[in-house]
Amino acid sequence: CGVPAIQPVLSGLARIVNGEDAVPGSWPWQVSLQDSTGFHFCGGSLISEDWVVTAAHCGVTTSDVVVAGEFDQGLETEDTQVLKIGKVFKNPKFSILTVRNDITLLKLATPAQFSETVSAVCLPSADEDFPAGMLCATTGWGKTKYNALKTPDKLQQATLPIVSNTDCRKYWGSRVTDVMICAGASGVSSCMGDSGGPLVCQKNGAWTLAGIVSWGSSTCSTSTPAVYARVTALMPWVQETLAAN
């Protein structure tokens, strides 16, 4: 897991406001969650052939689909996999009011076929550390300006630093809890439509899922950290759910 066949190229600190187009296929775990009309509403990450992790607040149902192997949503010619969702496992501790425990696991009805452009991200162990200042990456088809009418066609990426929860609370106060991890305030920001997608950090050469795009500034301010679900804190529930299903 976590080693793309097509290497990503990050130009350092490039939403994904102020992001840049990704190299096609270089974030092979990134999926698009689309409703029955083909509208992209959230991102997600493949963690195996059968499972996708996304944000609980995305409100995914079994009538939505997971699209894997996509880069340009404006192209009909891409070799994408449109995968039906068999079952939705929303974290029972998720609260829409506090946005805590913002994680949902999707069991695919038919497994994804792994290829050069479709593969899994690594999950962290529950005790893994992603220290403040560590440079990580986030990807998505979210808005590139908060007031944009539509989302970009091409997958966007940005490099951004982890922000400690203590520093993050300087912006957000007590809303930031230990089931969250912050990143950004560095000239880039996740934005609407990126939700559910990955915040990944490279550990020993493999990209590992540190966060799930959860919430942040309503104007996608690039000087304010965005808040992600902290995957390490949610790993006990993830392991339990995968083991039981």
Curated annotation (Swiss-Prot):
PANTHER family: CHYMOTRYPSIN-RELATED, CHYMOTRYPSINOGEN B. Its main location: secreted. SMART domains: Tryp_SPc. It comes from the Eukaryota. Belongs to the peptidase S1 family. GO terms for molecular function: serine-type endopeptidase activity. GO terms for cellular component: extracellular region. This is Chymotrypsinogen B. It catalyses: Preferential cleavage: Tyr-|-Xaa, Trp-|-Xaa, Phe-|-Xaa, Leu-|-Xaa. Pfam families: Trypsin. Keywords: Digestion, Disulfide bond, Hydrolase, Protease, Secreted, Serine protease, Zymogen. Its EC number is 3.4.21.1. It is an enzyme of class 3 (hydrolase). It is found in: Secreted, Extracellular space. SUPFAM superfamilies: Trypsin-like serine proteases. Residues 16-243 form the Peptidase S1 domain. The active site is at residues 57, 102, 195. GO terms for biological process: digestion; proteolysis. Disulfide bonds join 1-122, 42-58, 136-201, 168-182, 191-220. Signal peptide: none annotated. Residues 14-15, 147-148 form a propeptide. PROSITE patterns: TRYPSIN_DOM, TRYPSIN_HIS, TRYPSIN_SER.
